[in-house]
Amino acid sequence: MTIARSLLARLGLVRRGVPRDDTLTPDATKHDRRAMDRALELARGAAARGEVPVGAVVYETATGHPLGEGSNAREERSDPAAHAEVEAIRAAARAVGDWRLNHCTLVVTLEPCAMCAGLIVNARVGRVVYGADDPKAGACRSLYRLADDPRLNHRASLVTGLERESCAALLREFFRARRNGS
């Protein structure tokens, strides 16, 4: 176990075999479903550009009005922080003229990583909806619980598994093609 993982385990941020119960998770709404459709379109566009196929949309929770969107752009920008969630949250903050996004929902095709989960907390995003779990880097539920950790100054409610199979299939196909040299 690495020092960092050991520290995270002591802080209770590492999942140990059995996932914790998501008691705060509400069901997906029609706005979530519409945003996920768009996030999947964005993810397909990322794949066509040779990027890992992840798409994200931020919308105003009460109205469903879209405020920002993004897809992975790490390769084309040579920017390790150019994740779909970062792009969507930045665009939403610019659109509303405020970094506080309590009134917003982030919909993303893949469970956010630690960097993106930290941004979710710092931007105070109210809800997060994601499709596929990420057992290797997921920081909302799979490996860590950063987005709803009660010790942090903000917690987002989570909805998981929306269009799970579509999101996971897109990733599987992308990495299969990459391994086969396509």
Each predicted region: which residue ranges?
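Short, basic and Ser/Thr-rich N-terminal targeting/leader segments
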Residues: 50-54, 102
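Glycine-rich oxoanion-binding loops at beta->alpha junctions
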Residues: 86-93
